[in-house]
A protein has these predicted regions:
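Conserved catalytic alpha/beta core of Sir2/sirtuin-type deacylases, generalized to analogous enzyme cores
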Residues: 1-345
Length: 345
């Protein structure tokens, strides 16, 4: 794969993408050699910066179409002709009761349950597991045992699965929001609001029942309501105004104090490690939002001769030729790659 796109080596990931021309390459060795190299880099890197996109959650089993959609949204599919969870998020439902019934299901089955497959847990085991109290994110933080590797995660995913797997929230930057948060339509309120309690009530009101593990399931008779009671329509707790999801769709997205703090921590982590042996590990990042993770990772790798860029993605694993010698591109399912890694020596 090749192209005449542009690329610059900017340490902060912002850089002028027109600064130099380059070719894109996808071949960096055999699959086995690439996995072996990645395994070594994970073991030897001073720091690992994980950039995660939608492909990681897909690998974890959070698919937006197919069996999961047909199981939990069959009634919406039949009535409205909706074919997947993603497009359903944009559907013009007839009233707020139906709109929020949809969203409560969408949130619950993508945010408040554990991932069907263990890829997040496998990544956690590679980088975390507390061993020593010699590394903290901020000086003002109370000293805590450090992870196996000094790491940070930046992700465009909004499903909270890194935290559910045990990752330290002080090492996470969710750039595009969180399914677990509402924001007010009142633009003057720059706050977000936890929605877990509301989601549980809304799910129950539609007829979902909890199984022996406390997870909501479709009842045996299959009867569900596609509306929530009017009194359950979520409102802003501060001024009673309507709420929307805290998901980046336009300039109304609220970057609250938690978001700003995470952004600051991420920038500080990059600064402190800019000349060290850093592994930029990109997982499941596609071409929809390359300026958030992919391009900055390329730029920072080019700027630091001690850095290595690794990409695992199904059908979209490539890198600029300028960093070819320090690039590891693996085309395939992320879970499968991490399952193979312990077997390769």
């Amino acid at each position: 794969m090749s192209g005449g796109q542009a690329f610059s080596a900017d340490r902060n990931g912002g850089g002028d993408m027109r600064a130099m021309s380059y070719r894109i390459i996808s071949e960096t060795g055999s699959r086995e050699d690439n996995i072996k190299r990645l395994k070594k880099e994970i073991e030897t890197a001073d720091a690992i910066i994980i950039g995660a996109g939608a492909g990681l959650s897909t690998s974890a089993g959070f698919t937006y179409s197919g069996e999961r959609f047909e199981k939990y949204f069959y009634d919406f599919a039949k009535r409205f002709g909706i074919r997947d969870m993603y497009s359903g998020g944009f559907y013009p439902f007839p009233d707020d009761e139906t709109l929020w019934a949809w969203w409560s299901r969408h949130i619950y089955f993508n945010r408040y349950i554990d991932a069907p497959k263990p890829v997040y847990d496998m990544i956690y085991d590679l980088v975390d597991g507390r061993v020593a109290a010699d590394s903290v994110i901020e000086k003002k933080d109370e000293p805590v045992a450090a992870p196996k590797k000094d790491y940070f995660v930046i992700t465009t995913n909004v499903d909270h699965q890194f935290q559910r797997a045990g990752f330290d929230k002080k090492r996470l930057f969710y750039t595009q929001g969180d399914y677990g948060l509402f924001q007010s339509v009142n633009s003057k309120l720059k706050k977000t609001y936890d929605n877990e309690e509301w989601v549980m009530k809304a799910m129950e009101s539609q007829g979902f029942v909890k199984d022996e593990n406390g997870v909501f399931q479709v009842p045996e008779d299959g009867k569900l309501s596609m509306r929530i009671p009017t009194e359950l329509i979520p409102k802003c707790p501060d001024d009673g105004s309507d709420v929307t999801m805290n998901l980046r769709a336009d300039d109304t997205f609220v970057e609250d104090e938690g978001w700003k703090l995470a952004s600051s921590r991420y920038s500080d982590f990059l600064r402190r490690h800019e000349d060290m042996h850093v592994l930029y590990l990109e997982l499941g990042v596609g071409a929809n939002t390359p300026v958030i993770i992919k391009y900055p990772f390329w730029q920072m790798t080019a700027a630091n001769p001690n850095a290595v860029y690794a990409c695992i993605n199904y059908g979209e694993a490539f890198a600029p030729e300028v960093i070819k010698e320090r690039a590891i591109c693996i085309d395939g399912d992320i879970l499968t790659v991490f399952e193979e890694m312990p077997k390769i020596h």
